[in-house]
Amino acid sequence: MALEDHRFPCDNCGSDLRFDPGDERLVCDHCGNVEIIEHGPWTQSRAIAELDFEAALKALPDDPVMEVTRVSHCPNCGARVEFDPDLHATECPFCATPVVTDTGPSRQIKPRAVLPFALEEKEAREAMTEWLGALWFAPNGLQEYARKGRRLSGIYTPCWTFDADTKSSYNGARGIVYYEDHKVVRNGRHEIRRVAKVRWTPASGRVARFFDDVLIVASEALPKRFRSGIANWDLTRLEPYLPEYLAGFRAEAYTVELEQAFREARGVMDRQILRDVKFDIGGDRQRV
């Protein structure tokens, strides 16, 4: 399987083109040439193809769902980031650790969709400056980075999404809270104390739910508390994957494998199904 080439030279001057988030096209910063992305969703309607889970697990290295890319592994934070073929040394975009790029190929499942960048670098910088201004305490390194006006680099974060059509049978119990009055003596005085009791009755049934695009971040470069904060993407804006969207940006390769991601997604589904079961049982309290 050949190494994927995600470079897009300008037809006019030969410089590298980059994806322009503002107008969703490829532009050349050297000569100003503009090229329309061919077969993009705005010129040809295409549905996003999804993969069967079991089939993806069994995919062989030369299967069409696989691709070969050149990936660098950060020894500090563990990020795996794709780099241009002519780049031999750089720094990790997550932790700034110096990295020597790996010239060996990396096989992985090819992306099926992409959520294109929507902000230009100028807009992203303004948003970062506004965010820093609202903080009581900001890391000195981050403030210094912003003051120096260093260029921001956009990076695509990999994610898995899972669909599942579930039907679950359950056996449990429905609890109805009632109260009993008990006479007690406290400090020599007679008092009435109300005690909550629960009357349990058997309950059983069946619930069904279709899960659409349960999203699991496939990167471990960021701490988990930050990963959960970036998982709320607007997936209605997904486009069928084209490498042109990555031109001028970096793309992180996934470090959370498909099976591990499915276990996390199943945990999300299990918790929702449990809520559905408790709602179906009804009452004041539930046992499942």
Language-model segments: what does each one mean?
Residues 14-16, 34, 79-80, 98:
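Cys/His-rich metal-chelating microdomains
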Residues 10-13, 28-31, 74-77, 92-95:
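Short cysteine-rich clusters marking metal-coordination/redox-active sites
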Residues 1-16:
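Generic start-of-chain signal for non-secretory N-termini
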Residues 19-20, 37-38, 83-84, 101-102:
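Short, non-ligating residues that shape and space the ligands of small metal-coordination modules
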Residues 5-7, 25, 67-71, 89:
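Residues immediately within or flanking Cys/His clusters that coordinate Zn2+
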Residues 66, 109-288:
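Charged, low-complexity helical/coil segments in non-catalytic cytosolic or luminal regions
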Residues 23-37, 91-92, 99:
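Hydrophobic or amphipathic alpha-helical targeting/insertion segments
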